[in-house]
């Protein structure tokens, strides 16, 4: 007997991961080499249409074999493994851009599979503010596998500062967007709760303008910016460690190398909403919610808008 005969569910999970990787290849590059088995021969090149057809067939085939759509916390068995909701989410992504991939739109199917996620036991996380951290912030914190936010996590990539130490994943997302002055903690503690502040990526003015359309963004730290914007998502920091203002815009192309040219983005952190310490001083505990229920709502909104 093959492994597929012995454990149908795990085999379906592995096939999902293969499909997800092929989806990204197709989406990013178009025509890509395709193979379903290890071989010394060069893999044949598939067109986007061929890849789309494979992905649709593969996901529809494995969906009934995956576990029931069930949100979990890090203490639950199976946390981090995909279930039916992940297949629905990937199908909705595939159908949303079907016109680009194949020439034929599939808005109805995109809406249908997004709705399956929306109607499942996975939900948008709307929990109470904890120690000053909003429900939105709790999605991107060091205890997001424990604080209740994982009810929204259709496919979490597990992180633990001791057990999965990595310079990539969520450590990159927080370290690359912080310098030592960025202050998002409601208690006024600067930084992201790791030792890493690489001062790299930051916001363009056009992003700030979405939250402050009247060009009136205040020069405050991120822990005050959300109140000024009236929006929990406005996690921008406008002050440097020495109290000097960050420039809201990069006026010249040669200024993009200076981190203070642009507001910092303080979305991902390694703080724990319950106030407990991180597991490691350097590496991140923050799970990466690669697929979130919020995406299903956005997909459904776009698909139905284009349908109508």
Predicted features and spans:
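Short, histidine-centered active-site or binding-site loop motifs used for metal coordination
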Residues: 38-40
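Conserved, well-structured interaction surfaces
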Residues: 1-29, 42-53, 59-74, 263, ...
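Elongated scaffold/linker segments in the mid-to-C-terminal portions of large proteins
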Residues: 125-297, 304-306
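Aromatic-residue-lined binding/catalytic grooves and analogous aromatic/hydrophobic interfacial grooves
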Residues: 26-35, 52-76, 80-202, 308
């Amino acid at each position: 007997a093959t492994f597929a005969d012995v454990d149908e569910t795990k085999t379906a999970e592995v096939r999902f991961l293969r499909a997800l990787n092929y989806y990204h290849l197709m989406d990013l590059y178009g025509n890509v080499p395709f193979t379903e088995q290890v071989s010394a021969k060069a893999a044949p090149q598939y067109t986007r249409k061929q890849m789309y057809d494979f992905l649709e067939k593969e996901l529809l085939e494995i969906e009934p074999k995956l576990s029931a759509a069930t949100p979990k916390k890090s203490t639950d068995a199976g946390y981090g493994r995909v279930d039916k909701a992940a297949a629905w989410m990937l199908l909705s992504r595939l159908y949303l851009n079907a016109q680009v991939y194949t020439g034929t739109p599939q808005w109805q199917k995109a809406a249908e599979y997004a709705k399956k996620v929306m109607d499942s036991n996975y939900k948008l996380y709307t929990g109470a503010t904890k120690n000053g951290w909003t429900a939105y912030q709790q999605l991107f914190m060091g205890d997001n596998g424990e604080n209740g936010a994982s009810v929204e996590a259709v496919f979490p990539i597990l992180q633990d500062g001791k057990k999965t130490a990595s310079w990539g994943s969520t450590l990159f997302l927080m370290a690359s967007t912080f310098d030592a002055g960025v202050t998002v903690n409601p208690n006024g503690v600067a930084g992201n709760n790791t030792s890493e502040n690489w001062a790299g990526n930051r916001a363009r003015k056009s992003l700030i303008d979405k939250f402050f359309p009247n060009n009136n963004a205040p020069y405050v730290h991120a822990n005050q910016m959300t109140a000024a914007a009236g929006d929990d998502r406005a996690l921008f920091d406008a002050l440097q460690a020495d109290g000097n203002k960050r420039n809201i815009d990069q006026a010249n192309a040669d200024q993009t190398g200076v981190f203070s040219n642009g507001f910092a983005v303080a979305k991902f952190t390694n703080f724990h909403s319950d106030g407990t310490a991180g597991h490691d001083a350097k590496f991140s505990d923050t799970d990466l919610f690669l697929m979130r229920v919020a995406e299903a709502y956005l997909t459904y909104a776009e698909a139905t808008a284009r349908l109508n």
